[in-house]
């Protein structure tokens, strides 16, 4: 089941939605796509707007609505909804300064999460990396395109908590 939380903090359950499509790939922002119809969700349906939070009730994972489009008409009006994981909120932080020289992965993570709701854990050891320049971009972009690449690390996320490892999961794992 899903729950929608509007920009004012009001929440309502979303029922009778389509089969969820979740995409999880290493070092990318997970997404969630679903279809929902007004006749089954009158109160919640009117709360759906861009940037609202959709929570998967079972896993408690939170996603932010990035885009939705209207489908059907009359009694069968609905929305196709596309969401990105709440970790996308890291891109609300513009890093206007830079780190230079030899940096640990911890100093880099401190740099990108400072002043945000995000926390992190580093579960493996990593050598320092010598940066010409790290920053002057959005925090999530720096994580995905610089920190993870240069430290040869992978991440997984549970809402506002990021876990950094050398390897997430096992190779040749079968995902249902």
Tell where the protein language model's regions lie, with residue ranges.
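Amphipathic, non-transmembrane alpha-helical segments in extracytoplasmic/periplasmic proteins
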Residues: 25, 33-34, 83, 97-120, ...
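Juxtamembrane "anchor/assembly" segments of surface/extracellular structural proteins
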Residues: 1-47, 84-88, 153
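Short beta-strand-centered interaction patches in the first periplasmic/extracellular domains
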Residues: 69-90, 124-176
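A generic structural signal for short, solvent-exposed coil/turn residues
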Residues: 12, 26, 46, 57, ...
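Surface-exposed cap/loop segments at beta↔alpha junctions
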Residues: 41-120
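Ser/Thr- (and often Asn-) enriched beta-sheet segments in non-cytosolic proteins
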Residues: 1-5, 11-13, 33-35, 53-55, ...
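Solvent-exposed, flexible loop/coil residues
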Residues: 18, 94, 133
């Amino acid at each position: 089941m899903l729950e929608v939380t509007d920009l004012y903090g009001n929440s309502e359950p979303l029922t009778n939605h389509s089969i969820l499509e979740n995409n999880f790939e290493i070092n990318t922002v997970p997404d969630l796509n679903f279809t929902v119809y007004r006749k089954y969700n009158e109160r919640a349906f009117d709360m759906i707007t861009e940037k609202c939070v959709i929570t998967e009730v079972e896993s408690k994972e939170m996603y932010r609505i990035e885009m939705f489009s209207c489908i059907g008409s009359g009694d069968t009006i609905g929305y196709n909804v596309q969401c990105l994981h709440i970790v996308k909120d890291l891109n609300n932080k513009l890093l206007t300064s830079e780190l230079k020289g030899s940096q640990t992965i911890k100093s880099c993570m401190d740099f990108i999460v400072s002043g945000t709701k995000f926390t992190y854990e580093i579960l493996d050891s990593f050598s320092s990396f010598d940066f010409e320049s790290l920053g002057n971009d959005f925090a999530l972009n720096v994580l995905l395109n610089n920190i993870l690449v240069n430290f040869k690390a992978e991440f997984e996320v549970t809402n506002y908590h990021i876990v950094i490892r050398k390897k997430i999961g096992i190779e040749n794992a079968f995902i249902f």
